[in-house]
């Protein structure tokens, strides 16, 4: 993404945090095939609760977009992400006998709730589209980076129980969606005042750190499912 200077700088600045994510117990165990199904099931539940609120960040971004072209980008990319993620996630949930309708009545764990509150605050109270994108991009971009690295480092992971999830996020289609979102963010952040650009960097970093806390949280299973 060297042709996207603002987004590229954000990613480079936060790579140390993303590398910490890759070293978390949850992802290490997924990589070596020792992750318990209880932990994975809990991850799926937390991810489902997260995605419900995540979609709202896109909705705020759409309302703050200033052109029809930008609005269409939000719509098409959100549709891709939801369809791509939902298909695999729902299949896993079905294998565990979990219905999404039942999951939605559960409370997010504190680490997840703190992440959601951070994103919602940035999108709701930000000046415009840029803040919404800074809130949602760390999740999307870091997932692509993490699972590409994981698959490259341990190709055999694709043949494990978790392979479908890994392959989803390491796929060319997901990478293309990340690229499109990065381009949208670059356009939204071009010409920002130094003060607002600094706020956007702060939001991006905060959400990257929440990603780390989310992965750390997933090392222990929920006790209510």
Region locations from a protein language model:
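Secondary-structure edge/capping motif, primarily at the C-terminal ends of alpha-helices
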Residues: 61-65, 122-126, 150-154, 188, ...
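Acidic, carboxylate-rich catalytic segments that either coordinate divalent cations
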Residues: 199-225
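Hydrophobic alpha-helical segments
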Residues: 2-6, 119-120, 216, 220
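Long amphipathic all-alpha helical oligomerization modules
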Residues: 173-205
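Short alpha-helical hairpin
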Residues: 11-35, 54, 182-191
């Amino acid at each position: 993404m060297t042709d996207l200077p603002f987004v590229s700088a954000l990613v480079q600045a936060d790579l140390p945090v993303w590398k910490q994510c890759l070293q978390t117990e949850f992802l290490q165990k997924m990589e070596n095939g020792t992750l318990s199904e209880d932990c994975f099931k809990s991850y799926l539940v937390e991810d489902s609760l997260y995605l419900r609120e995540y979609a709202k960040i896109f909705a705020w971004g759409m309302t703050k977009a200033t052109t029809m072209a930008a609005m269409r980008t939000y719509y098409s990319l959100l549709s891709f992400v939801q369809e791509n993620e939902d298909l695999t996630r729902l299949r896993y949930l079905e294998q565990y006998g979990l219905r999404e309708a039942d999951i939605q009545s559960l409370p997010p764990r504190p680490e997840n709730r703190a992440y959601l509150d951070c994103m919602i605050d940035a999108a709701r109270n930000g000046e415009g589209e840029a803040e919404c994108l800074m809130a949602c991009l760390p999740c999307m971009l870091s997932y692509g980076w993490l699972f590409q690295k994981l698959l490259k480092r341990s190709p055999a992971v694709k043949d494990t129980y978790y392979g479908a999830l890994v392959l989803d996020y390491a796929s060319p289609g997901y990478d293309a969606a990340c690229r499109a979102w990065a381009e949208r963010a670059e356009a939204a952040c071009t010409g920002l005042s130094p003060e607002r650009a600094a706020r956007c960097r702060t939001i991006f970093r905060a959400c990257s750190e929440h990603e780390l806390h989310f992965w750390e949280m997933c090392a222990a299973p929920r006790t209510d499912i």
